[in-house]
Amino acid sequence: MSMSDPIADMLTRIRNGQMVEKVSVSMPSSKVKVAIAQVLKDEGYIDDFAVKAEGAKSELNIALKYYAGRPVIERIERVSKPGLRVYRGRNDIPQVMNGLGVAIVSTPKGVMTDRKARATGVGGEVICYVA
């Protein structure tokens, strides 16, 4: 059975994995998921990630990050969904928790944070909020 929203599945696996204090979570890989994982790593929300290819299928493993026994990611939520896409222009990209969190945005120049999108001067689809 095909998944209707693989990105929401990725975010849910991360959220559930941190709730039960797992060291890592794995999921089917895609270019967008790898790009989101790279942004999460660059921003310090996850320790690391790796893509393991097995023939035609590839798997994305994400090493979750904790600080003082608590998950680093307090909140991670999907914004743009298959039934309701959310696009924002370069001047309308939202801030998460007044700049303490990040919004992950898919732009014509790739997947990036809200701060980088504003600095680059591009808008795009708001994928999720992370705090």
UniProtKB/Swiss-Prot annotation:
Which superkingdom does the taxonomy of this entry point to? Bacteria
UniProt KW keywords: Ribonucleoprotein, Ribosomal protein, RNA-binding, rRNA-binding
The UniProt entry's coiled-coil ranges are none
Q: Report the record's disulfide bonds.
A: none
Show the GO MF annotations: rRNA binding; structural constituent of ribosome
Gene Ontology terms: cellular component? ribonucleoprotein complex; ribosome
Q: Which terms under GO biological process does the entry name? A: translation
Question: PROSITE patterns per the record?
Answer: RIBOSOMAL_S8
What HAMAP family does the record point to? Ribosomal_uS8_B (MF_01302_B)
Instruction: Tell me which PANTHER family the record gives.
Output: 40S RIBOSOMAL PROTEIN S15A
What the protein does comes down to:
One of the primary rRNA binding proteins, it binds directly to 16S rRNA central domain where it helps coordinate assembly of the platform of the 30S subunit.
Q: What is this protein called?
A: Small ribosomal subunit protein uS8
